[in-house]
């Protein structure tokens, strides 16, 4: 029969062909080859060849090729490519994007006028706006007409045929530079040769979470896995989190230490973006991204020492033996699409929002160990990534073998002195990369009796979301889809994820009862303030007053956690409080988090309700801080517009809070001087560059002070320490805010 071997990219196509020749296996890269058609050769192609809107494997009006057997190698690495093929992304300069924008501009403006104006101006700092699901369902014919008009445009001709007839089951998202249309799930059955194959085989070394295989390839969650009996085949890895053991260790400290090791070993660093790659410029010029990754891998494999940086390349490459003795995962993988970034925003604070990122991290770890006898040290760095893995217990999302290897390395570190300097931590790494006999024995014994799981690890929510999509798209059974979603929502405990799932429920309810869909969306706001507002908006205000005395609040939040976890979270927050371009969202989120970590009620009204201040703190005794963040400002004076925003936020506070509540208006801006056209109120307080730096410095000192044995768990001692560093309400306003100046 017809057999196809499918890989993520052309680099691997060539690799498979070479290996097939060595093994004496006949292969071809053309579906027209007679040897393929008569079944004597295996067709080797990349994933884009199989899945595209003009695919000869099911999307042609005639002459489609059938497949009896399909094997997809490194299937987890193919997931993103398949998603891309089944979605449309058009730059805003394209006529298609302009027409789609004109169709929905009123809907976007009604959601968030500031974001709308930023997107209109092409401001790279702008957020993302998604067309309300009810409007997309109402206007699917108009949207279809636009896409049909441009169906031969190079930007959409390979994508549009796959989703053009299911636009009512799609999300449409706008950014400062593009519009993206993506279905709720992948209609994989469009590629008939794949859907109708007698055998479909999926190969992957990543077994920590198989949910995407269900959502993308529609794999039955009950299929059996064929895997090695034991996990000892993955080789020897020591996984270390230096900043989790000693939060005072900085990224710079780790970089300097790795540069030393690069004199003797190949050190490979995987970063999420080109921007983060710049951090490594002072220790290496060997930085490789998608455009030169093939040459980069060849260079790395030909060397035995040096430091190399790979940009956003967590899968699809092999660096065996001496080509990689230390692999470094620096930072959280970036979201791939606008919709993924929007989903991240919806799921802020929920562990469910980061599972796919954890899977990418594990894929990255695997680049440096390619056989049973191979070995490699793994360094996890970057405060935000360490905080997610360590504090949020996301390590539990790793595969069983990776969890075991992480546990063994952690046990080794516990044997060190309590100081755990960076030198001591890296001396632990030496056990692995120098193959200390005792360590090798420990490592092998740990995995010798550890078996792989025989069933797919698929989240129930993923299965239900897939079934709801199939019932609606394939059968038109919206009632059944809605029933599945309601049952899932009722079973979900995580409030943020529950609210997100209610948004998905409302999308299917819209087909059955639009009024109920709006009610569901309004109810979802009670669980998750990040999701879109219903048609009539939301008028409730978060009750921040349900907090205890400051030190007690901190103690209760971390009752079952240790001080290192608190310090890690605090480091993540204050590290992001910087005056810099394109950073206001991270700044506002971090300032909100700082308030929570200081034991205060903290929220982001403007982000939640599209009205009110950037950040609102409740500091006790009916007193609030109303804060506007202008950390991206570069002007020497504070503009009239900035001033009016803070005045407007104070007005919002007075209109929405009881008269016995008071607020302190605070402006965060590099300057303290208002423009002569501005009219600041007398009680305005300022946090400028000097004040912000003083605050961050004293927060770090506070963290060092509470790391002393016994302080963090002692409410009285913790309260005294807050007072010492002026981190109580009165101390904060007196020490870290200042008067403003006014231009005469």
Model-derived segments and spans:
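Interdomain/boundary linker segments immediately adjacent to catalytic/signaling cores
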Residues: 521-524, 528-582
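Conserved coupling segment at the C-terminus of the helicase ATP-binding
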Residues: 63-69, 74-265, 274-280, 394, ...
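Conserved motor-coupling elements within RecA-like helicase/translocase cores
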Residues: 31-44, 279, 286-309, 314-315, ...
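Conserved RecA-like ASCE ATPase "motif II neighborhood" in helicase/translocase motors
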Residues: 42-74, 78-85, 182-186, 296, ...
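Catalytic core segments in nucleotide and nucleic-acid processing enzymes
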Residues: 274-277, 288-302, 331, 355, ...
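Inter-Walker segment of RecA-like/P-loop motor cores
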Residues: 14-62, 294-300
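Conserved RecA-like P-loop NTPase helicase motor core
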Residues: 300-386, 633, 670-671
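Conserved Walker A/P-loop ATP-binding site and its immediately adjacent core
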Residues: 1-31, 49-52, 208-212, 270-277
């Amino acid at each position: 029969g017809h057999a196809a071997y499918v890989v993520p990219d052309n680099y691997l196509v060539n690799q498979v062909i070479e290996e097939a020749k060595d093994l004496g296996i006949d292969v071809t890269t053309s579906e027209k080859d007679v040897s393929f058609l008569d079944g004597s050769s295996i067709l080797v192609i990349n994933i884009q060849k199989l899945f595209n809107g003009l695919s000869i494997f099911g999307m042609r009006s005639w002459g489609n090729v059938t497949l009896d057997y399909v094997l997809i190698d490194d299937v987890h690495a193919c997931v993103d490519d398949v998603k891309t093929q089944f979605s449309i992304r058009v730059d805003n300069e394209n006529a298609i994007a302009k027409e789609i924008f004109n169709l929905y501009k009123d809907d976007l403006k009604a959601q968030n006028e500031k974001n709308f104006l930023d997107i209109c101006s092409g401001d790279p700092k702008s957020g993302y706006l998604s067309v309300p699901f009810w409007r997309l369902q109402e206007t699917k014919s108009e949207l279809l007409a636009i896409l049909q008009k441009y169906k031969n445009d190079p930007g959409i001709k390979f994508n549009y045929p796959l989703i053009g007839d299911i636009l009512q089951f799609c999300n449409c998202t706008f950014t400062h530079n593009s519009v993206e249309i993506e279905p709720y799930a992948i209609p994989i059955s469009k590629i008939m040769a794949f859907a109708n194959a007698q055998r479909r085989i999926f190969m992957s070394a990543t077994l920590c979470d198989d949910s995407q295989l269900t959502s993308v390839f529609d794999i039955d969650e009950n299929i059996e896995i064929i895997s090695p009996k034991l996990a000892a085949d993955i080789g020897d890895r020591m996984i270390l989190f230096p900043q989790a053991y000693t939060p005072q260790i900085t990224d710079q400290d780790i970089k300097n230490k790795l540069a030393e090791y690069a004199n003797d070993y190949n050190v490979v660093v995987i970063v999420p973006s080109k921007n983060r790659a710049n951090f490594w410029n002072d220790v290496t010029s060997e930085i490789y991204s998608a455009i030169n990754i093939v040459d980069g891998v060849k260079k790395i494999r030909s060397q035995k020492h040096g430091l190399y940086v790979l940009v956003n390349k967590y899968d699809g490459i092999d660096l065996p033996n001496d080509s990689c003795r230390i692999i470094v995962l620096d930072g959280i993988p970036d979201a791939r699409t606008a919709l993924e970034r929007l989903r991240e925003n919806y799921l802020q604070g929920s562990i469910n929002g980061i599972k796919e990122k954890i899977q990418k991290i594990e894929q990255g770890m695997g680049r440096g160990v390619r056989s049973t006898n191979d070995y490699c040290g793994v360094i996890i760095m970057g405060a935000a990534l360490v905080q997610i893995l360590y504090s949020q217990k996301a390590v539990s999302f790793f595969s069983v073998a990776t969890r075991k290897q992480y546990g063994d390395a952690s046990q080794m570190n516990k044997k060190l002195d309590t100081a755990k300097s960076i030198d001591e931590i890296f001396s632990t790494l030496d056990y692995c990369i120098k193959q200390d006999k005792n360590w090798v024995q420990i490592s092998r014994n740990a995995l010798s009796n550890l078996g792989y799981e025989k069933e797919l690890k698929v989240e129930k929510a993923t299965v239900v979301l897939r079934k709801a999509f199939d019932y609606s798209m394939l059968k038109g059974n919206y009632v059944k889809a809605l029933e599945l979603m309601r049952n899932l929502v009722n079973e979900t405990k995580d409030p943020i994820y529950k609210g997100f799932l209610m948004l998905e429920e409302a999308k299917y309810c819209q087909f059955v009862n639009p009024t109920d869909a709006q009610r569901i969306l309004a109810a979802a706001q009670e669980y998750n303030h990040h999701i879109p507002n219903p048609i009539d908006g939301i008028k409730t205000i978060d009750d921040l007053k349900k907090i205890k005395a400051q030190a007690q609040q901190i103690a209760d939040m971390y009752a079952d956690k240790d001080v290192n976890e608190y310090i890690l979270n605090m480091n993540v927050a204050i590290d992001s409080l910087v005056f810099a371009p394109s950073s206001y969202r991270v700044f506002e989120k971090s300032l909100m988090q700082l308030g929570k970590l200081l034991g205060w009620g903290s929220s982001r009204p403007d982000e939640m309700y599209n009205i009110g201040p950037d950040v609102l703190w409740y500091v006790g005794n009916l007193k609030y801080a109303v804060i506007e963040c202008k950390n991206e400002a570069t002007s020497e004076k504070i503009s009239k517009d900035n001033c009016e925003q803070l005045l407007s936020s104070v007005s919002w506070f007075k209109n929405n809070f009881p008269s016995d509540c008071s607020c302190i208006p605070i402006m965060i801006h590099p300057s303290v001087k208002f423009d002569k056209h501005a009219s600041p109120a007398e009680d305005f307080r300022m946090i400028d560059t000097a004040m912000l730096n003083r605050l961050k410095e004293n927060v770090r000192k506070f963290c060092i002070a509470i790391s002393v044995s016994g302080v963090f768990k002692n409410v009285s001692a913790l309260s005294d320490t807050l007072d010492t560093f002026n981190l109580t309400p009165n101390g904060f306003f007196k020490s870290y805010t200042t008067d403003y100046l006014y231009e005469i």
